[in-house]
Amino acid sequence: MVQHQLRARGIGDERVLAALGRLPREQFMPLDSRRLAYEDCALPIAEGQTISQPYMVALMSEALRLTGHERVLEIGTGSGYAAAVLGRLAASVISIERHPALAEQAAALLQSLGFANVTVRIGDGTRGWPSAAPYDAIVVTAGAPAVPASLTGQLAPGGRLVIPVGVAKQQMLMRITNQNGRLLREEITPCVFVPLIGAHGWRTPE
């Protein structure tokens, strides 16, 4: 997977490649789809959500420019797969999931795999997690109609937010960097994610 799906498509951060290469993706998937664990595609999990394709997890993780010392906020825990990757790359991770069943399952799995630096919380991810802000990096694993000010406001100086922005089935992956209070926006690649539901996202699934 690392050589043919990630490195061959331009992922060059060795720490990101190592993190994905060591992580058993099948453990984050339903039993009936584990045979597809190393296919480079998103796959359904519970609650109408998906586990992101390995390439997209790698691309988003690389875009965060993590060195190992950062405090990271993830919006949309899902299966916990991306949170585990981030746990290998950063000092600490808070991951927010709006579906209690998914949050509880992911938290238990992450604990069983030894990710003591990853904490899963239940809540509206579009609000961020202000009590632990600011964050060096924030990543959103669902598509937003616009960049929530509630999230950019929780970035530390120099902090990066990586988020898909756009309408259903037509989004642009963006990186927003807090440069001393000024927000620098960069386009990374077109993408398609499930909708980001919440007070500062979509109100209902598209």
Predicted region positions:
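Class I SAM-dependent transferase core
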Residues: M1-T77, Y81-A84, L89, L102-T119, ...
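Conserved nucleotide-cofactor-binding alpha/beta core module
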Residues: R65-L184
